UniProtKB/Swiss-Prot annotation:
Organism: Drosophila ananassae
Family the entry assigns: Belongs to the arsA ATPase family.
Swiss-Prot/TrEMBL keywords: ATP-binding, Cytoplasm, Endoplasmic reticulum, Hydrolase, Metal-binding, Nucleotide-binding, Transport, Zinc
SUPFAM superfamilies, sorted: P-loop containing nucleoside triphosphate hydrolases
Compartments it resides in: Cytoplasm; Endoplasmic reticulum
Keyword Transferase assigned: no
Enzyme Commission number(s): 3.6.-.-
Record-annotated active site: D58
UniProt-recorded name of the protein: ATPase ASNA1 homolog
Role of this protein: ATPase required for the post-translational delivery of tail-anchored (TA) proteins to the endoplasmic reticulum. Recognizes and selectively binds the transmembrane domain of TA proteins in the cytosol. This complex then targets to the endoplasmic reticulum by membrane-bound receptors, where the tail-anchored protein is released for insertion. This process is regulated by ATP binding and hydrolysis. ATP binding drives the homodimer towards the closed dimer state, facilitating recognition of newly synthesized TA membrane proteins. ATP hydrolysis is required for insertion.
Length: 336
């Protein structure tokens, strides 16, 4: 391949300008600055899209720290923005842990059926968290955000999250097949509990609705016009190794990936004037940047700087987010 190939634009401008995108996942190894990158991307998207939602699926929930604002399981407007919202979900949570807001607008029978459904779901391992995820996706789709950015947990959890629509499809299909067998018993069970309005058909309808939404999401996740994944790494061996594993797994899952962010880079203007540790780190980073250039010549590779101060608060993120659009250039130090 390649000596004649023009390197691709080293920014995320290609994503921000792709109007058809509905779902953008941002992920990588722990400690590489995923949350700063996903929050910055969401801020840039908010400039050109009608409404943007950033969802943290990392149990550490760093987006509250990044924006210096407490977020919950329900979309909340980010301070300083009119069209940027954030929420935090636990991908391992069960259906009963979802807040009641998720069931607003449902009739009383369906709200009560949440508990009955939980009893049925307990019989199928792994379906509980899948159903919780299904409810979240239903809520998100129902709110019609222009684009949703996922700030994901470290790599292993991320791959599970992306595979979840398929797990849910299988699980809900199983539940619906069980329906005919359990319907008489279920009707008897709910009438004993005094829930006359709840019946097997009500639950079945709820499951059918969920299955339809999840099937739709599953199709969208595999459509590169609607879904893409941004890998975040640092210029070190283990991070690069993890990134390559992630790219291969995503390709296997049929998820589009063509953007890599290399974060926390030293931009030395004169390595001779730098301390020995900085000069040494700079050399190591240059070595891995060369490897990244060889491995990912058909990717957009965005390089972000290691800063003296942490990126925290909406204004700080707004300022840092410009580096996603325009390649970072260090400011020249004034001569003494």
């Amino acid at each position: 391949m390649g000596d004649n190939l023009e390197p691709l634009e080293p920014s995320l401008q290609n994503l921000v300008e792709q109007d058809s995108l509905k779902w953008i996942f941002v992920g990588g190894k722990g400690g590489v600055g995923k949350t700063t990158c996903s929050s910055s991307l969401a801020v840039q998207l908010a400039k050109v899209r009608e409404s943007v939602l950033i969802i943290s699926t990392d149990p550490a929930h760093n987006i509250s720290d990044a924006f210096d604002q407490k977020f919950t399981k329900v979309p909340t407007k980010v301070n300083g923005f009119d069209n940027l919202f954030a929420m935090e979900i636990d991908p391992n949570a069960g259906l009963n842990e979802l807040p009641e807001e998720y069931f607003e607008g449902e009739n009383e029978a369906l709200r009560v059926s949440k508990g009955v459904m939980q009893e049925m779901i307990n019989a199928l391992p792994g379906i509980d968290e899948a159903m919780s995820y299904a409810e979240v996706m239903k809520l998100v789709k129902g709110m019609n955000f222009s684009v949703v950015v996922f700030d994901t947990a470290p790599t292993g959890h991320t791959l599970r999250l992306i595979a979840f629509p398929q797990v849910v499809e299988k699980g809900l299909g199983k539940l619906l097949r069980l329906k005919m067998k359990v319907a008489p018993m279920l009707t008897q069970f709910v009438s004993m509990l005094g829930m006359a309005d709840v019946n097997a058909d009500t639950l079945s309808q709820k499951l059918d609705d969920m299955l339809r939404i999840i099937t739709q999401v599953n199709e969208q996740f595999k459509n590169p016009d609607q879904t893409t994944f941004v890998c975040v790494c640092i210029a070190e061996f283990f991070s690069l190794y993890e990134t390559e594993r992630l790219v291969q797994e995503l390709t296997k899952c049929g998820i589009d990936v063509h953007n890599i962010i290399v974060n926390q880079l030293l931009f030395l203007q004169n390595s001779h004037d730098s301390c020995s540790m900085c000069a040494s780190r700079y050399k190591i980073q240059e070595k891995y940047l060369d490897q990244i250039a060889d491995l990912y010549e058909d990717f957009h590779v965005t390089k972000l700087p290691l800063l003296e101060k942490e990126v925290r608060g909406p204004e700080s993120i707004r300022s840092f987010s410009e580096n996603l659009m325009t390649p970072y250039e260090p400011k020249a130090k004034p001569k003494e």
